[in-house]
Amino acid sequence: MATIHELHKKLVNKEISAVELTNAVIAHKAKVEPTVHAYLSDSHDRALATAKLVDEAIAKGEAISPLAGIPGAIKDNICIKDEPATCASKMLENFVPPYNASVIERLQDNHYISLGKLNMDEFAMG
């Protein structure tokens, strides 16, 4: 398993593309998700679109942030515009925020790749 720093180097050195890395994580997720049930929702299309933007920036020789092109996920109590934010609660099962949390704005500004929302104890009370 590689660190974020190691993956960043591989992206910058064009040893792997952000799209390839994102697809690899999506494939691994598909294998383990039926057993672990970690995700409440996914955003693969948005993730791949961001990965493509990162690859284009690298191809142009632009500097990228250390988080650019790095796939991961966000706990379900963090608001992402137009994605469900249920806090793993039935009470909020239909809530879709019209805004991003500040942390999401920062991650998106740095082209972090979110694959979806992660399960958790209801309202993070566990």
What are these regions (language model features)?
Residues 15, 62-63, 83:
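Conserved SET/PR domain catalytic loop and adjacent active-site segment
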Residues 17-18, 64, 114:
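Residue-level detector of short coil/turn "hinge" positions at structural boundaries
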Residues 68-126:
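Short glycine/serine-rich loop/turn segments
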Residues 1-49:
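An N-terminal boundary/leader segment
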Residues 28, 32, 50, 54, ...:
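Short alpha-helical functional segments enriched in proximate histidine and acidic residues
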Residues 44-67, 74, 93, 97, ...:
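Flexible, acidic active-site loops/lids enriched in D/E/S/T/G that coordinate Mg2+ and/or position polar
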Residues 4, 58, 100-101:
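Generic non-transmembrane alpha-helix signal with a bias for helix starts/N-cap capping motifs
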Residues 36-39, 61, 121:
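Short, polar/charged, Gly/Pro-enriched helix-capping and turn/loop motifs at alpha-helix termini
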